[in-house]
Amino acid sequence: AGLVKNLYMVNLVLNAEMLLSEIYAGHYLKSWEKACEAVDRIYRVDVPERADMIIASCGGYPKDMSLYQGTKTIDNVESGLKPGGTLVLLIEAREGGGPAEYFDWIQNWVSGTMEARLREHFTVPGYIFLLNCEQAKRYNILMLTSVAPETVAPMGLKAFSDIESLMKCAQPEGKKIYVIPNGSTVVPRVKGESL
């Protein structure tokens, strides 16, 4: 955008109900910054410290229709989770990974060629797949989902079809836990930390 002289931009900010909340227009950078401030004001929730565990729902269908869509919840809530912490993600994922090619990237991840291959043949689903794998390296991600455990195991994600097995693995006893019912529209942040 910076290459175009006198670029005028309109930024729309939606609320959690996906209704128009605010509009910012003008110089591309200034209107974008104002929109970012509005998003921060609308969606940020201050927390006193990072949690050992976050239990988050994507917010139901269509926000949890696939791992591709559910990534938004992981992105949002990780700012409130300690490194190495546990994320319990409630995501039906009735459409599996989402785009057909999402799980096609597994072999590249397992063989260690993911990043190089993605640089050669970039796709957004490939990028989201890589992002999910990298998140699974930073956090213990346990999902209550319809996705088969063996499908996501190579990514480092753990899938469960029943809450009892999941919670046994999560071991919540004695941990600082945040529960976020609509993780796709909530961004926890420790006061004073920047994203």
Role assignments for model-derived ranges:
Residues 1-50:
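Conserved, well-structured core segments that form the ligand-binding/active-site neighborhood
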Residues 1-4, 45-49, 79-81, 133-136, ...:
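Solvent-exposed alpha-helices and their adjacent loops that cap or buttress functional pockets
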Residues 15, 59, 92-94, 146-147, ...:
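Short, ordered loop/turn segments at secondary-structure junctions
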Residues 20-26, 66-67, 92, 99-103, ...:
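Short acidic, glycine/serine/threonine-rich loops at helix termini
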Residues 34-43, 72-76, 124-133, 161-171:
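A short, acidic, amphipathic alpha-helical segment used as a generic capping/interface helix at domain edges
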Residues 52-57, 88, 178-179:
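Structural motif
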Residues 64-142:
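C-terminal catalytic subdomain
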Residues 146-195:
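Extended hydrophobic packing segments that form well-structured cores
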